[in-house]
Amino acid sequence: MSRLSVLTEAIFQDKHNVMIAGIAGSGKSYLLRQLYDESVKRGIVSILTSTTGVSSFNIGCSTIHSFTGIILPTQMPKDPEEFVSRIVTRIKFKRYLLKKWQNLKILFIDEVSMLGANYIDVVNEVAKRVRGSSSPFGGIQVIASGDFLQLPPVNDSFCFESPCWEELRFKNYVLTKAYRFTEQKWNDILQRARVGKLTKEDMEVLKGCVNKKNNSDIQPTVIYSLRRDVDDLNEVALDDLSSEFITFIAEDTLGEEEKTGSVNIIRHCSEEQSKVLDSTLNIGRKIKLKVGAQVMLVANLDVAMGLVNGSRGVITKVEADNVIVKFKGKEYEFEHPISPYAFKIEHQGEYYVRTIVPLIPAYASTVHKMQGLTIDCGIINCGSSIFSPGQAYVALSRVRSLDGLFLEQISQSKIYPNKLALNFEEKMRKKAVFIDREINDEEV
């Protein structure tokens, strides 16, 4: 049986809550999207969400924060009961929100590993009260995917530490094959890096990538741990180019979905609505670039050509509304015009659309921003730059191949997992079903 067949039976026939785990590049997000599409075909009221903007864009969904309308403060309120009551009152006051919660049958959550325990507890309690049911999530079936050995939640503990996780009694499935990486040696190294068990031979291969020469006009993206380092490098690199700055301003609009699936634009966004787009998308309202700038494509334009989210290139010229970019293909470099692109998200019953050239400076990016992305080539410091578990693994697993990997430093002691997450995974795997099938590279 295929992955889809196995999970279709578990979800739609046996009605299990399901957790889909697996290594980076194993197709978790793609499979979750397939399962959501299957639920829609069956006429089941479902919502597909993710915990991050990058992932939500990749699989075409809203963030879970956008769906629930729940944003936790940096620190949990002193009176959680009063906080939950306020949220429930707000939902009951707005008919469309109440109807959305009450009619929902299945909630799909991608990148669940970045969902915190406090957050899932609050959502669980809100769902129970709004739906008038003491069942976990008020009786909503939960289908989640993620890798707890990647990055943890920000300012929160893991969701599996929440009492709610035990209540949900997930049926666990593990995807064991990585399809993002076509090179077996690289795939094997990453699987061992994930659990902190690199061999002497692995380290020799990685050391061979330290100070490696790049023979392409397309410079590798530098992956940093800290945002300030990213901003500094992107700014300095652009300033060093002798060409003039070209500024692109986004058009933010509201729309409604037509029967054809297209979005009919109604009006321009307010400032608050534009802020929703800011927090969800991996692209801002204003982009400053130059001819000669290293850029990253942040939209899936043409999979067959290799023009996908994460593709790297360099701007060669600008013609009217088009930016001409030289991209790094699988076998050769090629130029292609990039036009303004409409990024769409669904938020509280409306479609928010940001139209702008889908390119960002790619001299540097943070590890956090890179989770969920794949790039052709990257420079990584797996030494002094790493300060938390899972960081090195996430950074390394963003790069498609050993050929595209360039290291500043490599220290085996910096490539280690979160012990709590590792213990959880080991326990989960003892009760899990391991599934796999052959799929095309484009599907992952």
Regions picked out by a protein language model, each given a short descriptive name:
Residues 1-444:
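Conserved ATP-binding/catalytic motifs of P-loop helicase motor domains
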